[in-house]
Amino acid sequence: MNRTVDYELLTKQLEGLTGQVPYEITNLSNAAALLWESLPDINWAGFYKMEDGQLILYPFQGKPACTRIQVGRGVCGTAVAEDATQLVPDVHEFPGHIACDSASNSEIVIPIHVNGKIWGVLDIDSPNLNRFTEKDKAGLERFVAVLEGIL
């Protein structure tokens, strides 16, 4: 399967879906669905939002997921604690990885900021090792930048 993703097109599609929609859940639901339909070789795509000092499950596509993640735990919690994108080629080598789906082998998590604070994260998992590249990181960070402008 061709793994090339046109992130410029993906970002424009996101802008079209969310441009005139004032509802957070609606926009995040469509964003998760867009990623699910557009990215090859993934088994989960969605969001966690910061609530009461922890990450809470928000709209997603894929199997049922962990509902709460503590800051500093797992890939998502580390992304928040370090305020940095986590590109993990092999989650089984990541200290403290939380296995919500045992089929996941690689993961990318991008922090989302609103008004200068971490709002939450975009989390994408793959059953393939080394699924995510620096190109994916840059493209998904642009995708998140669009979301930051509407949340």
Predicted regions and their residues:
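Juxtadomain coupling helices with adjacent low-complexity linkers
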Residues: 15, 126-151
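Regulatory sensory and allosteric helical modules in signal-transduction proteins
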Residues: 50, 54-100
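Residues at secondary-structure transition points
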Residues: 5, 22, 66, 70, ...
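Intrinsically disordered, low-complexity terminal regulatory regions
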Residues: 1-59, 146-151
